[in-house]
Amino acid sequence: MNIHRSTPITIARYGRSRNKTQDFEELSSIRSAEPSQSFSPNLGSPSPPETPNLSHCVSCIGKYLLLEPLEGDHVFRAVHLHSGEELVCKVFDISCYQESLAPCFCLSAHSNINQITEIILGETKAYVFFERSYGDMHSFVRTCKKLREEEAARLFYQIASAVAHCHDGGLVLRDLKLRKFIFKDEERTRVKLESLEDAYILRGDDDSLSDKHGCPAYVSPEILNTSGSYSGKAADVWSLGVMLYTMLVGRYPFHDIEPSSLFSKIRRGQFNIPETLSPKAKCLIRSILRREPSERLTSQEILDHPWFSTDFSVSNSAYGAKEVSDQLVPDVNMEENLDPFFN
């Protein structure tokens, strides 16, 4: 289900009514048709099989089966018992799930932001179900080495649209990076922001933050340069610029194995843009990755940039000769070109 600001989320509670004698965390074991596969009713049990021949324990949570972990011990692949639909389930302590999901509850639905479909409350855990995904942007760009401008424009517009919606709704995302965006379809043409768990809810128009939150390669100069406050929205925009550059070039604009050297490069704000990119793409990158926060485009202004309305069939013919020889990141200098991005 979609989460709307004016509509309370529907919470399914199992084992709370007088007609229920068992909580879903205490359900009896369900046996599959094959004797070698057993199902455990306890959330703590799910784990990937050590070998294909060993039994694989899963959990029955309401009308869902929780299968193997996808990330750590709190994110699981889930399957709807009746429809067979595949989802993702995140597990939170019951005492803090509302705080963790507060940004989701205060933001209206958007096509490029992952939506909660259902929440089930147990005695000690909250099970939050999301639509499944088809990989993340980081892995996709790593596989492709870099993207052609037409594809990058289509995907980056969706990314910027999600960020602009969050900013308009009073959220600062703080930890923006390619890995945070996942694909909605197998064709990998539509993306969405994976979660809002790291977002900060603003109390009014002031977007000043003081925490040092984010991935080193995506952090903005002002976060490194000041011990005071900075504009959270402008810092998000800087991270968008790093994402766009990486999508088009195949590596971070600022990269170094040593963190101190990396931060020095970010503070200076100097980077090189390959000549293979079109003038409009270069313009957008430079308009975002400006050292002075007040000079950067806003997330909404990014969406209005003429690069997105480019006739790429004409643009490709003008710059195609250069792109053919520079489409993939070369294998030489692997440490320089790949490690800063693929870590």
UniProtKB/Swiss-Prot annotation:
Subcellular location: Cytoplasm; Cytoplasm, Cytoskeleton
UniProt key word Cytoplasm: yes
GO biological process: negative regulation of fat cell differentiation; negative regulation of interleukin-10 production; positive regulation of proteasomal ubiquitin-dependent protein catabolic process; regulation of MAP kinase activity
Expression tissues: Highly expressed in peripheral blood leukocytes.
Matches recorded under InterPro entries: Kinase-like_dom_sf (IPR011009), Prot_kinase_dom (IPR000719), Tribbles/Ser_Thr_kinase_40 (IPR024104)
Molecular-function GO terms, alphabetical: mitogen-activated protein kinase kinase binding; protein kinase inhibitor activity; RNA polymerase II-specific DNA-binding transcription factor binding; ubiquitin protein ligase binding; ubiquitin-protein transferase regulator activity
UniProt keywords, alphabetically: Cytoplasm, Cytoskeleton, Protein kinase inhibitor
rRNA-binding recorded as keyword: no
Renumbered residue ranges of the record's region Disordered: 25-50
GO cellular component, one term: cytoplasm
TM region positions: none
Major localization class: cytoplasm
Composition bias, Polar residues: 29-45
Domain Protein kinase: 61-308
Residues in the signal sequence: none
Domain comment as written in the entry: The protein kinase domain is predicted to be catalytically inactive.
Miscellaneous field: Antibodies against TRIB2 are present in sera from patients with autoimmune uveitis.
Family recorded in the similarity comment: Belongs to the protein kinase superfamily. CAMK Ser/Thr protein kinase family. Tribbles subfamily.
Role of this protein: Interacts with MAPK kinases and regulates activation of MAP kinases. Does not display kinase activity.
Subunit structure comment from the entry: Interacts with COP1.
Protein name: Tribbles homolog 2
Organism name: Homo sapiens
